[in-house]
Every structure is written in structure tokens, then in C-alpha cells.
Amino acid sequence: EAVDAGAQFIVSPGLNPAVVEWCLSNGIPVTPGCITPTEIEKALSYGLKILKFFPADVYGGVKGCKALFGPYKSEGVSFIPTGGVDLGNLKDYVGQPFIHAVGGGFLCRTDDLAAHNFEAITTTAKKAVEILLGFEFDHMGINADSPEKSEETAGLFEKAFGFVPKFGNSSNFAGPSLEITKFPGLGQNGHIAVKTNSMPRAIHYLSRRGVEVDMETAKYKGDKMIAVYLKEEYAGFAVHLLEK
């Protein structure tokens, strides 16, 4: 009935073999609820790796998901927790490698829907996106033209303000928020780094807002992207994302 009404995927609170088998036979993506190793192994036998975790607050929340993820990490299992998730604890789930997505009725409260209070729903959704992305200033970069100049500049900040220098291969830091490159980098005036909880989500979000990233500048740690610059400079500063 749900598919006939236009549903393109099915999410269920538990793992009902009849429902799962019907969905697989009819090419409908399905995400069953699984809260025990037995249920997870049953889902894996169907080739399903993205699983609902419901009700999340009753079965341990982040700790519960993490505990179940441990023995099935190599299988690529991830969870969609729902039930008891709200703006207050949403941040706890963000960035965890075993969390595929998060759901909750807090995004669209029944009374707001009944009253057609779409402004309140929009405000809540925007706040949720802000929490998911977690954009924060991380550091500012100063372009030096040599390793010696970079070290000298870091020393000046230490002498004046007590910013303890940290020396690296391609740059030096004066305290946690000032990076002095050893050679001229991107940006006429230097660069600004903005942290985010999720690089893929941040790039998608920015692209939807017409902000382009320069994928040629992307840096990886293994298969995971950890930094990438925007194509546009802001007031002479190159801007790059940095995953927390």
C-alpha cells in the first residue's frame, strides 16, 4: 500500500522477514530496525547494512550503536537512530562513523503540522542542519616566503603574546589558531580554515547554496577527505574546510 501510494523506500521499526523479502523482490530499498546482534546478522544475510536503531534512547543511544557497531564494523554496518533524538542530543550522534543518518519527530511536530506552522518547522530544520554541519572557525593562515621567515614569525607571536609555537613540515603554528606557512600558499592575504563535522555534508550543503569547492585542492587521509579549499577567495583570503 505504501509503495502504491508513492513511497520510494521503506523504513520499519523492526525486522519483519516478509516485509524485507517483499521489498527486495520488488526493488524497493528497505531499512529495517535492528537492536540486537541476531537481528543485525539476519539483516546482513539479506545484504542490508544500513539499519534503523529504534527506539534509540531506550536502547542506549550513541553508546548502544557503538557497542553493536564493534563486531560488525568490517561488514560496513551503520545505523539510523530514531526515537528520543532531539536538538539537545543531535550533536552526540554527529560525526560518529557508525551513524548513517538521524531521524526524529522533533523536526516536524504534530501540533505545528496541524496548525500549518511551517515557519516553526523551517526554523527547527535549519537549526538541525547547523548542528549537523557544525561550522566553526579553526585557524587563520599567514603566508611566509621561507621556512626561516615562518619560524621567525612564530617566534614573534611567542615573544609578544606567549603563543607557544608548534613546528611542522609545511608550516608552523603560533598557538592553536595562527598558522604560518613556510612557502607562499593559496590566498593573497593568507587563508582561513573552517571546521565541519562532515566534509561530504558540508560540500553538498555549500553546493546547494552556490558555493563551489576546488576538488583539485582536496587532501585525504586514506580514503577520507580531510581538507578542501573553496574556489572563491574572501577579501583576499583563501578559505578551506577542515573536518573535525
Per-range role (PLM):
Residues 129-154, 187-194:
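N-terminal beta-strand motif that seeds the catalytic metal site of vicinal oxygen chelate
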Residues 1-5, 38-47, 69-70, 85-101:
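Catalytic cores of alpha/beta
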Residues 122, 178-182, 207-244:
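Vicinal oxygen chelate
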Residues 7-16, 29-40, 49-59, 81, ...:
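Catalytic beta/alpha-barrel core
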Residues 20, 40, 65, 90-91, ...:
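Generic hydrophobic/aromatic pocket-lining and core-packing "Φ" positions
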Residues 141-181, 201-208, 219-226:
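Core segments of cupin and vicinal oxygen chelate
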Residues 13-19, 52-61, 98-121:
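Glycine-rich phosphate-binding active-site loops on the catalytic face of alpha/beta enzymes
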